[in-house]
């Protein structure tokens, strides 16, 4: 029998009542009935974890990586069975760690592997990769600029680097390494206008906001005790959410760079954050076997989604109330072998 604490998912504590003007009722918003949905878990036998999932910009495709050298892409409205995935292989010589989609084109995506030190660019309409970029560092996390022409990535050595897309002879677009000042950081992402970068570091208690392309430090708000692991930008441009080892999520006002509110629903280290398309809801992945959904404007916990495994990645669909997340079940003595998992929660219809 597994320990009792692994059988039961704790109920998140409710914070004090929020100001009335921030509530859904006063603002005329009818939230989804999250408790009516059930997680849909898709298991794949594997000794490795599925560690990253990402939606295409139109929400029609979902990519997952982590268990091998292959990137799997589903069209969730048609099915999420393993056999229904389109397989993209041949770009990497070792396990793929991360995948991200071009924000301006629903068929273009890229993958990275820390072991083979490559970032590979793909077109979902073709089986072969468009380009392989070999690096001197092991890439960990990548993010496109809003125009899809620049890539920021962080390395296993916790440093930030850039790739740029340019035209070569014949009009073909090619990505190449851009030489810039090396800045330390564990995760980096562009702001919505592309003129700034949000940078977190696993061993620093502050966030850093840099101007781009100068990389001048603009803001350094204190965020977490013991390091910051996750960050997400509100699509409305109001808030920056950050999560760290202290199990707390902070919401920073992007106008004044003060902490507008704090979410304390989680009992575990925060690993991933994602805002819904309208910015009203925040999904929180952690080292616990659940995903929390909280209201952005009140920080109130709305629903705790039971998960088969801790979720290293959670991500909302770009236009619907659907969350994708992934992970790997734990090995139990006398129990079944661990399996990789990709899960969906919400209504795709």
Regions from the PLM with identified roles:
Residues 2-349:
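WD40-repeat beta-propeller superdomains and closely related acidic/aromatic-rich repeat-like regions
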């Amino acid at each position: 029998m597994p320990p009792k604490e692994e059988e039961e998912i704790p109920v998140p504590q409710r914070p004090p009542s929020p100001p009335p003007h921030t509530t859904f009722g006063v603002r005329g918003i009818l939230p989804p009935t999250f408790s009516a949905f059930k997680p849909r878990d898709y298991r794949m036998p594997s000794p490795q974890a599925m560690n990253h999932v990402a939606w295409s910009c139109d929400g029609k495709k979902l990519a997952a990586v982590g268990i091998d050298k292959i990137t799997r892409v589903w069209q969730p409205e048609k099915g999420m069975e393993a056999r229904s995935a389109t397989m993209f292989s041949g770009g990497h010589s070792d396990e793929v760690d991360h995948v991200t989609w071009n924000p301006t084109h629903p068929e273009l995506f890229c993958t990275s592997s820390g072991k083979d030190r490559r970032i590979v660019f793909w077109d979902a309409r073709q089986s072969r990769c468009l380009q392989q970029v070999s690096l001197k560092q092991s890439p960990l996390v990548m993010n496109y600029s809003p125009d899809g022409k620049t890539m920021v990535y962080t390395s296993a050595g916790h440093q930030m680097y850039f790739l740029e897309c340019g035209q070569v002879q014949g009009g073909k677009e090619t990505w190449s390494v851009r030489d810039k000042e090396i800045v330390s950081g564990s995760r980096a992402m562009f702001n919505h206008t592309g003129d700034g970068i949000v940078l977190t570091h696993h061993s620093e208690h502050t966030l850093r906001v840099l101007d781009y392309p100068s990389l001048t430090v603009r803001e350094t708000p204190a965020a977490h005790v013991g390091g910051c692991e996750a960050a997400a930008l509100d699509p409305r441009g109001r808030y920056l959410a950050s999560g760290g080892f202290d199990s707390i999520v902070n919401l920073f006002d992007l106008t004044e760079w003060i902490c507008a509110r704090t979410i304390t629903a989680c009992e575990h280290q925060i690993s991933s954050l994602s805002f819904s398309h309208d910015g009203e809801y925040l999904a929180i992945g952690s080292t616990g076997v659940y995903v929390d959904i909280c209201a952005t404007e009140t920080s109130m916990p709305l629903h705790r989604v039971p998960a088969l495994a801790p979720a290293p990645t959670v991500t909302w669909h770009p236009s619907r109330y659907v969350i994708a997340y992934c992970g790997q079940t734990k090995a139990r003595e006398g129990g079944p072998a661990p399996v990789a998992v990709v899960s969906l929660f919400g209504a795709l219809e």
